[in-house]
Each structure stands twice: as C-alpha cells, then as structure tokens.
Design a protein with these regions (language model features):
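Conserved catalytic-core motifs of GNAT/GCN5-like acyltransferases
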Residues: 76-82, 88, 128-130, 134, ...
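Conserved acetyl-CoA binding element of GNAT-fold acetyltransferases
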Residues: 84-100
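Conserved acetyl-CoA pyrophosphate-binding loop and the N-cap/start of the following alpha-helix
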Residues: 102-114
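A short beta-loop-alpha structural element at the N-terminal edge
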Residues: 3-17, 28
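Conserved GNAT-fold acetyl-CoA-binding loop/helix
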Residues: 23-44
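Conserved beta-strand in the GNAT
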Residues: 58, 66-76, 92, 97
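A short helix-loop-beta-strand connector motif used in the catalytic cores of GNAT acetyltransferases and
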Residues: 44-58, 92
Length: 156
C-alpha cells in the first residue's frame, strides 16, 4: 500500500477533486466546480501551515502519477473545557474521500489512523465526524460511537 503523507499546497487541486467526489456522492447539490477556483488560494495557504489547526492526509494514486487516491481532512477547535475535557480541544473529521477506482484497499483507514494520531499529539480528547451509511462501519471499527446531537445550524 502507498504511504500516507501530509497534503502539501501543491496537492490543493487534487484535494478539491477528491472533496468533490465526496460531495457528489452524499448530496444532491450543484455539480458545478466553479467554486474550486475561489477555494484554491485559501486551501493552499492552509495546507502550507505546518503548525495550524487544519490538516489533510493523503495517499498517492498507485496507477495515476500525480493523482491522489485518498484524502482525509480534519481540524481542531477549542471549546471551553468541562470536567471530562478540561483543555477543550476537539477534533473534527471531514472530507474523507477515496477515488472510486482506488476503494477497498485500506487507504481511508490508513489516513484516518494518521489523522487520529495527529489529533492525539495536539491534545484533542474527543473527535467528531458525520458519517455516511457506507462509511459508518469503518468509523465504528476505529472506536467512534453514534451520539444523538441536537445540533442546529444557521447559514449566514
């Protein structure tokens, strides 16, 4: 299996390609990729911050030089602490995506394992994610458990 590595600024276009694959598989949304051009500068900058709160781990595609096979991205948020988590550092996983022709090879598991270690190293005691039905078995096997969430969202 190809090695997991941290995504670099020069991976930004491939990171967005894989994110789009994930979006297209989960949501009945606008298939346009016009938003990629606006997103690229910020993504490149974030990928270039070695000590930032955002990270992406990738696996290079074994059959397509220059392409990525898998992406896992996450961020750490600070929330005021509580008894079970005095530091208040919470990891959030998003954009777990594998190229359709590279699935079932263990890439997502390898990237997730690397991301979870990154969270641990930075003091996160909890990690959250939203799982698709197809991906839930992977996350459960890594120790995630369903949690009822009264989350409300406002789009500004």
């Amino acid at each position: 299996m190809s090695a997991v590595r941290r995504a670099l600024p020069e991976d930004a276009e491939e990171v967005l390609r894989l994110r789009q694959i994930m979006i297209d598989s989960l949501f009945a949304s606008d298939p346009s990729i016009a938003w990629h051009a606006e997103s690229l500068p910020t993504l490149r900058a974030k990928l270039g911050e070695p000590d930032g709160d955002f990270v992406a781990f990738v696996v290079e595609h074994p059959e397509r030089p220059g392409a990525l096979a898998c992406l896992v991205a996450g961020t750490i948020d600070y929330r005021i602490g509580k008894a079970a988590d005095p530091q208040g550092m919470v990891g959030f996983v998003f954009s777990v995506a594998t190229d359709p022709d590279a699935r079932r090879r263990g890439y997502a598991r390898a990237c997730m394992t690397t991301l979870l270690e990154w969270f641990r190293e930075r003091g996160a005691r909890r990690v959250q994610l939203t799982a698709s039905p197809q991906a839930e078995p992977l996350y459960v096997s890594l120790g995630f458990r369903p949690k009822p969430d009264p989350l409300l969202e406002l789009t500004l």
